[in-house]
C-alpha cells in the first residue's frame, strides 16, 4: 500500500497495529521505505490525484465542513453495512462457486454498463471532479453512459454512482475478485463530497463552497469513517493531492465523520468481522488476554458429582477419590443443586 499511496506508516499504526514495539516498528519502516523508493523509481513523484488549490479555505465555511463530516459519517455507515450484507449473501453461495461468479459478473457488468465511472478504481473520474470547471468536464465524467450530453443530470448521476459503487465493490469481492476497501472509500468519498457541494450551491444553503475542495474533503471524511482513522484520512489525502493548505477543514470533516460513525459502529471495517467473532485484539490488556484464552483449557472437568441423598460413608469415599477441593451435588437429571467444599468439612 505504501508503494501506491506513499503515506502508509500512519495507516499501519492507526488501523492495523494493536500494540507497538521497536521489534514491530522496524519491519514496518523498512517495508514502507523500500516500497516508496520503488514507487518513485517506477512511477515518479507525481501525486496520484491532480489537485490545485484555487479557492483557499475561509472561516465562514465551517458550518458546511461540519455538515459534510456528518454526511460522510452516514455514507461510511452505508458503505460498511452494505458491504457486510453483501458479503453475507455471497458467503451463502460458497458451495456454488460458479453461481457466485455468475451473480457477481451480472451485477458488476450491469452497473458498469449503466455507470462507466465504476470501471476500475475510478481515479480518473475523481481527478475530473477535482479539476473540472466546465460542462465539457462534466460530460467526461458521464462519458459512455446514458447520461452523456445531459449535464443538467450531473447531480443525479453523481448520486447514483455514489450509491452503486458499494454494490460494484461487493460484487467484485464476493465473486472472488479483488475490489478492496481502500480505493473504493476514496472514490465514494470524492463523489459524495462533490454531490454535497453541488446540492449546497444549487439550493444556496449558505455561502458558496468550492466543489473541488469539498471533493477532496469528502475523500478524507469517508476514509476516516470507514477505517476509524482520522490521522490517516487527513495526512493521506493531503499527501496524495498536495492539498496541505486545507488541513483545518480536513481536520473538521474527519473529526465530525468519526464522531458520527462511532455512534453506530465502534469498529473499523477491518476490525468489524473480528469483533463480531470475538477475536479482536485491543489495547485493553485484560480484554486481549480473555480473547487469547481458550475457555476449554481453564474449565475444570476432573470432578466427581454426588447425589443429595448419598450416605456419609460413601461421601468420604468420594472425597478421597477427588483431586479437587469441591464436590458438585447434582440430581438425577444432572442439574446442579450445590457444592460441597471439602476444606470446610
Task: Give residue ranges: language-model regions.
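Juxtamembrane interface elements at the cytosolic ends of transmembrane helices
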Residues: 6-10, 46-47, 70-90, 119-123
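Re-entrant/interfacial helical elements at transmembrane boundaries that shape
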Residues: 8-15, 49-50, 123-128, 173-193, ...
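The conserved cystathionine-beta-synthase
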Residues: 306-323, 329-330
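Short, small-residue-biased leader/transition segments that mark boundaries at the very start
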Residues: 1-5
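Hydrophobic core segments of alpha-helical transmembrane domains in multi-pass membrane transport
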Residues: 31-38, 65-74, 101-114, 162-169, ...
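Short beta->alpha transition motifs characteristic of CBS
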Residues: 336-345
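Membrane-interfacial segments at transmembrane helix termini in multi-pass membrane proteins
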Residues: 213-214, 220-227, 231-305
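Helix-loop-helix hairpins and the membrane-proximal interhelical loops
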Residues: 85-210
